[in-house]
């Protein structure tokens, strides 16, 4: 090197070593290539040939003026060469740079630093006088420069072009790393405050050498210093890096003196090579960085804020110390806030620090820092530097760990001693300061490692910041620099000593920050398109504009300053110190530029997607989707017409009505508000109150609807029948204009997330741009929720590398989103290739990518916006685009997968965390039912398992369980909650629900994966129907969203390498016509025929090859091979010449050729011999790409908008628009239509046809059930709003009684859980869907969306909370029902073991006979029932009773009754059925007598489980159930003294009553009345009413007992006390017909006669005769007459039945052939069944005579009693037939009223046939079949006073309300009149249908004239 090098070190070392590397003086670096040199700088041996010597001499002459300290100058003078060779190394003007610009340094992970990297650092061979200049031009051959930047640098740095040329062989260092390589690189700024986008090092070189180097010396080579304008080369720097590793020890040995001096501190033997790499590059602690000053990337890294950047200036000289200290290494950082420490004045400490410097082994140090430099030449004023003065006193800190070296400490101090530059002084070097070791090797390593932490953007930020800061404090900086010069040595000593403890972070606590002076930042230049940058800026004025308009994320400044450390290679800051696996060293060693280049080439063109804050917090996503939400998942429906909740209408009167009336006013947007109004207030007053809640002016025109009718503003609520707790819909009709909606938010608001869209209100369309996107797919795989972000990108495919049109697209205003330019060699980001020179826009999210195609926006198109409060607004649309087929990036969750369960658990935990810390934890717990409802797909066990970790499970006094927050639970940070559930996970889950919903409606519930039916398909028989159905199921399972997304992601996750594994075309095509891609996985082989597969399988069991199959050519005989060849048209002459094997070979060849050419051959004879055509993998890929490109082009052509095509099809488009308008009107009509006032059961009974002019298809049972469930959920929400006040009152005071509170519904706690022995949540068992309202504003609707909901009988069908469920074996099971007084409450009740007890006294469940609450407690033993079958009483089925059949058990009535939970009113249950069901089931009217002292009305009470299903389920639902038997337990015990007093009340009937005065059956007032009987009423009941009389309690009982006992539903026949209890079984048949219902009626004394007949059949004549004689003495004459009248009526009824059948037989011939055939068939079936029943009855009768016992069947015989009566056999047969008829018809229809007269029955039969005929004429009668609902015609009842329809007429016929044909015709005429009255002028097509209907009716009446006359004659006019 320079001669000064040798003088500084050779004096001590030259005599100690004589090997080839012994000289460390001038030119010692030449020894690496030229051999050893002597003391004079000459070579000690002639190693060079003549050419090399000439070249070296020429080079020395050229640079001679720059090498004053090297004796090589003399050598060069002696060996001067020709002038022509003087420019040998000059870069020619036409020189071409052949370096690969993509060739970059791979970093320490790939290129491990060798030993010579540390032995010979580049800085150590620099001249002391050129410390600054030589370090500035770092573009040596050791650096892998980005030559694109160097070309630009050459234009700006022409003077140094030549000097930098020869250094291109230096090892590669990335350009962004060089900025921090040395202190000089980071400390020089351009004088003109210019900041370019190139490396800081390049501009620093330009500033240093500007004006000092002439054009001749501007060679881009490493320089030692500048002298006389010439650049001096540094040969050792060029060649020393190539020193072999094995010579390292020998080089160390030549420093004998230095080595001995520091030998005591050398521990190089303890450190391995890999540890050296680790210690030099890993774990560097940037403790000086404050959080507020960070600019973060994806991998956090610190900004070296305190880095001192110096500006080029002129100084007179520089001290030796400054020369040392100016060599600031890359690994040292200087804080802008320095430590408050004074420097030690003792300069001798610098010498003493030499020992302390040697802390680590020599191989870990930059040992060349020990070289002592002397006689440094004076530097010219232009090459000096001035240190930045403004930041010096703020503080200083050296970063490093045990891996850092003394060089870092020296460099820190060196940077401070530069300050002598201002004084223009030259101080000779006098101290023995050693340079730090490792300035080359470690820096090369550290540069690469720091590269991951420092973005190129940071270089400009740092430079600009320091440059701006330098300008204002020059004067103060001079003083600080002087002080630093004085204290440098002491400070250096202490910092080096402290470096040992840098690994221990305790020293961080001792840092004192000087915050007296606020450091201001200058305006920064940001790359707003760089999405990888995350800025954190100060909250000052100049940064606000940047914050609002930055493209990258901006993180607000932390409120608390923290000293944080960072670790390269870690994902986050937290816990980096525990990263012991050294992940950085196992990362891919490519640089960020290389990774970015590879990323672009691999088609991963993705930008970061930002979501709004509400979306990240899942505030815009429902925890549970309703069935309507899932059904309309891909096409959400808006409600534009008021929709009444039928359940709410039914229950509104049952809610509390105390105080003012509560009304819920709800807008169509979904916003509801509860208002308190007086019942006499007007609607205008209600509207005024609603205006304050729903934010509209009182003067604004709004409409209010109640039950489909618009309310009049002037009338009061009471006058318009607005009930308490009602739901009133408010419709705002005014449309507001938003002309300025397209304006962007103001300057004080952000435009992009996360700064923008921080609240849900920010997500509205009231401002900003609106793009409408329409998906071309019917069911896109995934859809984003509200608030989720998406990126718009436009890809441009270059046609050539020089194509610059992509840059022009960025400047065009119509370009969508970011422009991504694809090079010619890049792959397309889509399945199809983008054509060269073309662009394609796309929308990209984290879930999918899809192409978009802009469409022409019509000038007349506007967007109508409706707010949640119902406000309508109109705004412009910015763009409208069509979204092509999605390419998923993530998989949709699969049902039953582990990912699904994990998501559900995490979603629940996130919900619970947020609720706990929002509610306050313990004060507002979370009900367990709430979690079960919201996360119904999780079982209770899973919920409890996960909740126990964070919450405590408790119960309240009502037995309700809830969760409270644990005291030790800490609120997790929001970032952790975001990681648990991302918005994309929610979308994936909702897509899965939509897929399951579709499968459910297709009837596919057992399979969710196509693989699950492969075995099932193999087992199917070869039947076309079965195979077609299986194929349909398989196809539907293949196109589920989870299968399609999984297939695509699996096949494209490796750069679309396996796209050929998809079908591309086929069933998965969403367009269905070749415009989309099919993501169904391709079958590995074509499926063979089923028969062929079986044969192959059968043969395969014997041998694994084709041997033995039909395709085996070896099985062909000579003749068979000849026949096959003849089919191939081979001449017989050729065949005859060939042998058998030649024939077989020819068959194989010909069949394979035809199969390959596509010729169709018979697959069973010829084609089966063809060999399969196999393609190579490349051929398959090419074929798949061609398919994709073909589909892509078709999709592009179809979805792109072309003006020409639009103009050509304008007329067609207009016609389509008209058609669409008509369809839209029909849809709106359908929305307004709905079901009206039809009950919920009517939804199951809808007919195919039209309502009005709209076609309405018949809804499936699944849809009906879902609609019912959604209404129940909606009603639960309404109840929650209504009961808020009640709940608040209950929290303040205890409930005084069960009868107080909010009424019978909704209950505060659910008692609707299924009461059965099986677990509720068992799979495939029974799905529970109970509804309950919680007082804490929560509600419960348990369901399972994944399971098969086989039958949903919602609580609408049982308004009092009762539900009907069916399990897998189709046996109905009911819940417990308790009937109490009015205003009762419902709460969940534990099922105790007591309920299994059966009382031996009264037969009731729940207590024993010794219980004082028993009705028969302490009663005489004689009065207790005898012979009770305990098995039957306990609910065990007998031999004649199917298992599981429910019973109507005795009703519990005791003092404990007020504790019961549920009140059930069969009365109300039947009301809901009377509009929709064909029959009302079997309503019963009970009348009973009670003690005279208790005559108040009381409802009937039932014991738990007493009403199972017969009376409630079948009656309420009107749906045929599997449980067909209803039982009434009739107590057979009666007091002897009661028999006489109660003889008047001994008539028992199970038939509904018929009131002749009113002409209608009381059974059609569905109720269970509990009215007490007065003495006069009892007599009337005996004669005119057919009731079940309940006797009073025994008069012999104590008074208190009698009063405490309330009347039971215990029916006692008039028998002696010794009679055991009997059961009357009523079965309902499975047939659905409405004939012979008159046979069901019985006389008031039927119960007595029944008992007598049973006794007669038992054969006890003697007892009967005795009983008759006894009773005849007691019976009064009046009663005798009644008795015989009943007998006559019974006989007459039997004759009427026969007459009716005769009428039926006569009418068969007159009816149409189809009807006649049906009636004949029914009659045959009926007669056969009756005959079977008679035979069974006879057999039973014979058995009973032999062995009388209690049996349950159609005929029941009582055990023998002495007082039993005996009646004729004829009466018994009549009773049997009555029961049989009742069983046959009761399933569908309510029991028909009694038809007492033959004429009435005949007339009813004829009229019913006429009605049925009219109903069959659907083309005429379809509009008149059902009553007109309010939704079809809201004003219908206002216009039509007497509505009539065929259903009503049929009901009146069955009730025998018509006395003649004129009454019947009048009702048909009423239909015609109503049709004209309402539809004239509205629907002109309807009145003609009504006219035609009346004409047909008249024709039928004439046809039946004779029969009608005969029937009318038999009708008593006085009757």
Swiss-Prot record:
Biased composition (Acidic residues): 143-158
Source organism, top-level taxon: Eukaryota
Description of how the protein assembles with itself and partners: Component of the TFIID complex. TFIID is composed of TATA binding protein (TBP) and a number of TBP-associated factors (TAFs) whose MWs range from 14-217 kDa. Interacts with TAF7 and TAF14B, and (via N-terminus) with TBP1 and TBP2.
Keywords: Activator, Bromodomain, Chromatin regulator, Coiled coil, Nucleus, Transcription, Transcription regulation
Bias kind Basic residues: ranges: 1736-1745
Region span, Disordered: 1-25, 143-169, 1287-1314, 1408-1679, 1726-1746
Name this polypeptide is given: Transcription initiation factor TFIID subunit 1
Function of the protein: TAFs are components of the transcription factor IID (TFIID) complex that is essential for mediating regulation of RNA polymerase transcription. Core scaffold of the TFIID complex.
Organism: Arabidopsis thaliana (Mouse-ear cress)
């Amino acid at each position: 090197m320079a001669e000064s090098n040798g003088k500084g070190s050779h004096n001590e070392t030259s005599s100690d070593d004589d090997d080839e590397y012994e000289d460390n003086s001038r030119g010692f670096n030449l020894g690496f290539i030229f051999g050893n040199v002597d003391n004079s700088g000459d070579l000690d041996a002639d190693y060079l040939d003549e050419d090399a010597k000439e070249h070296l001499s020429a080079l020395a002459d050229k640079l001679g003026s720059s090498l004053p300290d090297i004796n090589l100058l003399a050598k060069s003078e002696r060996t001067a060469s020709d002038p022509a060779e003087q420019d040998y190394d000059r870069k020619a003007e036409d020189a071409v740079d052949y370096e690969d610009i993509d060739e970059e340094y791979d970093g320490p992970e790939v290129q491990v630093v060798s030993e010579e990297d540390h032995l010979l650092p580049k800085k150590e061979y620099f001249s002391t006088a050129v410390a600054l200049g030589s370090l500035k031009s770092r573009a040596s051959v050791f650096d892998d420069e980005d030559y694109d930047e160097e070309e630009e640098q050459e234009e700006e740095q022409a003077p140094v072009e030549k000097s930098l040329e020869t250094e291109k062989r230096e090892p590669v260092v990335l350009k962004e790393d060089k900025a921090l390589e040395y202190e000089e690189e980071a400390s020089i700024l351009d004088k003109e405050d210019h900041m370019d986008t190139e490396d800081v090092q390049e501009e620093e070189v330009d500033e240093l050498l500007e004006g000092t180097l002439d054009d001749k010396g501007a060679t881009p080579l490493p320089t030692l210093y500048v002298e006389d304008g010439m650049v001096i080369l540094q040969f050792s720097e060029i060649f020393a890096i190539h020193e072999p590793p094995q010579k390292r020890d020998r080089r160390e040995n030549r420093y004998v003196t230095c080595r001995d001096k520091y030998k005591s501190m050398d521990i190089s033997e303890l450190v391995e090579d890999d540890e050296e790499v680790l210690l030099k590059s890993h774990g560097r602690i940037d403790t000086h960085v404050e959080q507020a000053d960070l600019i973060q990337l994806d991998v956090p890294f610190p900004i070296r804020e305190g880095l001192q950047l110096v500006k080029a200036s002129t100084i007179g000289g520089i001290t030796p110390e400054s020369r040392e200290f100016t060599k600031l290494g890359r690994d040292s950082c200087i804080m802008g806030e320095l430590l408050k420490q004074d420097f030690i004045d003792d300069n001798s400490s610098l010498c003493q620090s030499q020992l302390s410097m040697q802390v680590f082994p020599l191989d870990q140090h930059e040992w060349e820092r020990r070289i002592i430099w002397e006689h440094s030449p004076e530097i010219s004023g232009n090459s000096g530097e001035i240190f930045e003065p403004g930041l010096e006193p703020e503080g200083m800190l050296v970063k490093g760990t045990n891996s850092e070296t003394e060089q870092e400490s020296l460099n820190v101090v060196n940077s401070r001693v530069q300050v002598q530059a201002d004084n223009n002084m030259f101080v000779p070097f006098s101290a023995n300061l050693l340079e730090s070791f490792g300035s080359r090797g470690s820096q090369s390593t550290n540069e690469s490692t720091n590269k991951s932490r420092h973005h190129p953007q940071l270089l400009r930020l740092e430079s600009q910041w320091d440059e701006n800061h330098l300008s204002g404090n020059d004067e103060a900086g001079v003083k600080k620099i002087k002080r630093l010069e004085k204290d440098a040595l002491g400070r250096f000593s202490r910092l080096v000593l402290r470096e040992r403890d840098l690994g221990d972070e305790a020293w961080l606590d001792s840092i004192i920050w000087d915050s007296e002076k606020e450091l201001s930042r200058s305006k920064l230049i940001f790359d707003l398109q760089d999405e990888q940058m995350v800025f954190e800026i100060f909250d000052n004025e100049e940064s606000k504009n940047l914050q609002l308009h930055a493209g990258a994320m901006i993180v607000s400044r932390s409120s608390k300053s923290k000293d944080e450390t960072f670790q390269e290679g870690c994902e986050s800051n937290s816990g980096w110190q525990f990263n012991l696996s050294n992940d950085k060293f196992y990362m891919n060693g490519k640089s960020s530029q290389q990774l970015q280049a590879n990323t672009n080439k691999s088609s991963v063109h993705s930008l970061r997607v930002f979501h709004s804050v509400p979306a990240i917090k899942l505030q815009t996503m429902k925890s549970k989707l309703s069935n309507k939400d899932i059904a309309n998942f891909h096409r959400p429906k808006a409600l534009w017409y008021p929709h009444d909740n039928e359940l709410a209408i039914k229950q509104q009167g049952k809610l509390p009505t105390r105080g003012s009336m509560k009304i819920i006013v709800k807008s169509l947007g979904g916003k509801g508000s509860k208002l308190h109004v007086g019942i006499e207030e007007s609607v205008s007053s209600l509207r005024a109150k609603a205006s304050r809640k729903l934010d509209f002016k009182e003067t604004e025109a709004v409409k209010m609807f109640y039950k489909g009718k618009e309310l009049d503003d002037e009338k009061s609520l009471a006058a318009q029948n607005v009930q308490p707790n009602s739901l009133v819909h408010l419709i705002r009709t005014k449309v507001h204009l938003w002309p300025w909606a397209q304006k962007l938010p103001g300057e004080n608001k952000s435009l992009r997330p996360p700064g923008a869209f921080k609240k849900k209100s920010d997500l509205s369309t009231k401002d900003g741009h609106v793009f409408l996107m329409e998906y071309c797919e019917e069911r896109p795989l995934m859809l984003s929720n509200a608030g989720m972000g998406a990126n718009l990108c436009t890809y441009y495919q270059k046609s050539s590398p020089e194509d610059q049109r992509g840059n022009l697209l960025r400047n065009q205003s119509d370009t969508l989103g970011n422009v991504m330019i694809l090079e010619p060699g890049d792959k397309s980001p889509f399945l199809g290739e983008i054509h060269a020179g073309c662009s394609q826009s796309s929308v990209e999210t984290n879930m999918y990518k899809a192409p978009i195609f802009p469409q022409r926006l019509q000038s007349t198109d506007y967007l109508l916006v409706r707010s949640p409060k119902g406000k309508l607004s109109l705004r412009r649309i910015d763009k409208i685009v069509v979204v092509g087929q999605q390419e998923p990036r993530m998989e949709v969750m699969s049902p039953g997968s582990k990912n699904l369960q994990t998501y559900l658990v995490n979603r629940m935990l996130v919900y619970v965390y947020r609720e706990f810390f929002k509610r306050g934890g313990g004060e507002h717990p979370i009900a367990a039912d709430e979690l079960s409802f919201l996360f119904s797909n999780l079982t209770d066990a899973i919920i409890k398992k996960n909740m126990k970790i964070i919450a405590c499970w408790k119960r309240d006094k009502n037995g309700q369980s809830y969760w409270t927050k644990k005291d030790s639970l800490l609120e997790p940070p929001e970032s952790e909650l975001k990681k648990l559930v991302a918005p994309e996970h929610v979308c994936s889950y909702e897509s899965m629900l939509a897929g399951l919903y579709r499968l459910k409606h297709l009837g596919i519930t057992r399979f969710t994966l196509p693989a699950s039916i492969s075995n099932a398909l193999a087992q199917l028989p070869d039947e076309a129907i079965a195979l077609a159905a299986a194929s349909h199921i398989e196809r539907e399972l293949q196109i589920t969203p989870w299968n399609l997304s999984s297939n695509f992601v699996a096949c494209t996750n490796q750069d679309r390498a396996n796209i050929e594994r998809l079908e591309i075309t086929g069933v998965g095509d969403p367009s269905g016509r070749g415009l989309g891609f099919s993501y169904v996985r391709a079958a590995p082989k074509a499926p063979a025929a089923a028969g062929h597969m079986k044969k192959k399988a059968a043969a395969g069991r014997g041998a694994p090859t084709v041997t033995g199959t039909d395709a085996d050519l070896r099985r062909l005989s000579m003749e068979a091979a000849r026949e096959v060849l003849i089919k191939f048209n081979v001449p017989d002459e050729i065949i005859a010449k060939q042998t058998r094997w030649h024939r077989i070979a020819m068959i194989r060849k010909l069949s394979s050729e035809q199969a390959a050419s596509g010729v169709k051959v018979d697959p069973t004879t010829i084609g089966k011999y063809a060999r399969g055509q196999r393609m190579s993998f490349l051929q398959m890929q090419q074929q798949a790409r061609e398919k994709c490109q073909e589909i892509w082009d078709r999709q592009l052509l179809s979805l792109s908008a072309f003006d020409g095509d639009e103009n050509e099809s304008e007329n067609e488009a207009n016609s389509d628009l008209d058609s669409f308008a008509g369809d839209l009107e029909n849809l709106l009509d359908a929305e307004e239509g709905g079901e009206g006032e039809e009950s919920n059961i009517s939804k199951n009974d809808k007919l195919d046809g039209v309502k009005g002019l709209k076609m309405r298809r018949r809804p499936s049972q699944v849809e009906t059930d879902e609609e019912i469930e959604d209404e129940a959920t909606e009603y639960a929400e309404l109840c929650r709003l209504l009961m808020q006040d009640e709940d608040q009152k209950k929290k303040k005071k205890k409930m005084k009684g069960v009868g107080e509170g909010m009424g019978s519904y909704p209950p505060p706690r659910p008692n609707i859980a299924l009461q059965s022995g099986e677990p509720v949540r068992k799979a495939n068992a029974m799905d529970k869907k109970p509804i309950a309202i919680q007082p804490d504003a929560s509600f419960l609707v348990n369901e399972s969306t994944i399971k098969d909901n086989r039958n949903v009988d919602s609580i609408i069908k049982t308004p009092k909370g009762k539900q009907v469920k069916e399990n897998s074996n189709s046996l109905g099971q009911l819940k417990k029902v308790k009937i109490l007084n009015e205003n009762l409450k419902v709460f969940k009740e534990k099922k105790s073991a007591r309920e299994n007890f059966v009382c031996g006294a009264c037969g009731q469940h729940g207590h024993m006979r010794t219980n004082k609450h028993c009705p028969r407690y302490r009663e005489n033993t004689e009065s207790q029932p005898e012979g009770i079958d305990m098995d039957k009483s306990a609910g065990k089925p007998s031999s004649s009773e199917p298992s599981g059949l429910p019973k109507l058990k005795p009703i519990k009535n005791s003092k404990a009754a007020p504790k019961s939970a549920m009140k059930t009113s069969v009365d109300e249950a039947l009301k809901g059925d009377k509009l929709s069901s064909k029959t009302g089931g079997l309503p019963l009217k009970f009348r009973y007598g009670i003690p005279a002292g208790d005559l108040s009305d009381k409802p009937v009470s039932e014991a738990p489980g007493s009403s199972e299903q017969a009376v409630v389920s079948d009656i309420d639902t009107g749906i045929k159930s599997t449980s067909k038997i209803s039982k009434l337990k009739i107590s057979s015990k009666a007091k002897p003294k009661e028999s006489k007093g109660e003889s008047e009340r001994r008539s028992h009937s199970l038939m509904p009553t018929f009131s002749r005065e009113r002409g209608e059956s009381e059974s059609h007032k569905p109720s269970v009345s509990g009215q007490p009987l007065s003495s006069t009423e009892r007599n009337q009941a005996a004669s005119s009413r057919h009731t079940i009389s309940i006797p009073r309690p025994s008069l012999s009982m104590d008074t208190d007992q009698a009063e405490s006992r309330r009347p039971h539903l215990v029916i006692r026949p008039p028998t002696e006390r010794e009679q055991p209890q009997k059961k009357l079984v009523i079965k309902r048949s499975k047939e659905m017909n409405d004939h012979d219902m008159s046979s069901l009626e019985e006389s008031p004394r039927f119960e007595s006669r029944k008992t007598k007949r049973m006794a007669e059949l038992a054969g006890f004549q003697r007892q009967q005769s005795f009983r008759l004689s006894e009773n005849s003495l007691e019976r009064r004459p009046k009663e005798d007459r009644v008795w015989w009248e009943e007998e006559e009526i019974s006989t007459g009824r039997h004759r009427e039945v026969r007459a009716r059948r005769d009428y039926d037989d006569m009418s068969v011939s007159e009816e149409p052939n189809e009807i006649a055939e049906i009636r004949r068939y029914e009659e045959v079936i009926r007669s056969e069944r009756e005959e079977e029943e008679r035979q069974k009855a006879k057999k039973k009768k014979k058995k009973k005579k032999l062995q009388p016992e209690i049996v349950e069947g159609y005929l029941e015989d009582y055990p023998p009693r002495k007082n039993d009566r005996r009646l004729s056999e004829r009466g018994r047969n009549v009773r049997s037939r009555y029961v049989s008829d009742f069983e046959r018809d009761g399933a569908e229809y309510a029991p028909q009223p009694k038809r007492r007269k033959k004429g009435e029955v005949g007339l009813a039969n004829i009229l019913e046939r006429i009605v049925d005929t009219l109903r069959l004429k659907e083309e005429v009668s379809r509009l008149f079949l059902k009553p007109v609902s309010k939704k079809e015609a809201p004003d219908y009842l206002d216009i039509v006073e007497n509505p009539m329809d065929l259903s009503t007429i049929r009901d009146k016929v069955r009730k025998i309300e018509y006395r003649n044909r004129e009454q019947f015709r009048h009702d048909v005429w009423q239909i015609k009149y109503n049709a004209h009255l309402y539809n004239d002028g509205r629907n002109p097509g309807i009145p003609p249908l009504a006219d035609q209907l009346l004409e047909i009716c008249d024709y039928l009446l004439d046809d039946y004239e004779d029969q009608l006359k005969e029937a009318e004659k038999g009708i008593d006019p006085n009757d």
